[in-house]
């Protein structure tokens, strides 16, 4: 998975899309680590935190820019974020 697909310029590292791609890359690495080290509970906690952060960013992106959100979840092959009921 490359970040260059989603980044328009190098100064755009704070964009929501870049952050989601970065979290997805970290989540994939940590998932591979946890397949080998099943009892690494601190890493499991870190994974849950990253998943939560990515999920919150996805919800925010879906609220402000729905076409970009749909494009991103298709390219990254991740599930759709749960919508807020409030």
Curated annotation (Swiss-Prot):
It is found in: Plastid. Its main location: plastid. Signal peptide: none annotated. It comes from the Eukaryota. The keyword Metal-binding does not apply. SMART domains: Ribosomal_S15. One of its GO terms (molecular function) is structural constituent of ribosome. Keywords: Plastid, Ribonucleoprotein, Ribosomal protein. It holds the Pfam family Ribosomal_S15. One of its GO terms (cellular component) is ribosome. GO terms for biological process: translation. Belongs to the universal ribosomal protein uS15 family. Part of the 30S ribosomal subunit. This is Small ribosomal subunit protein uS15c. It comes from Cuscuta gronovii. The gene is rps15.
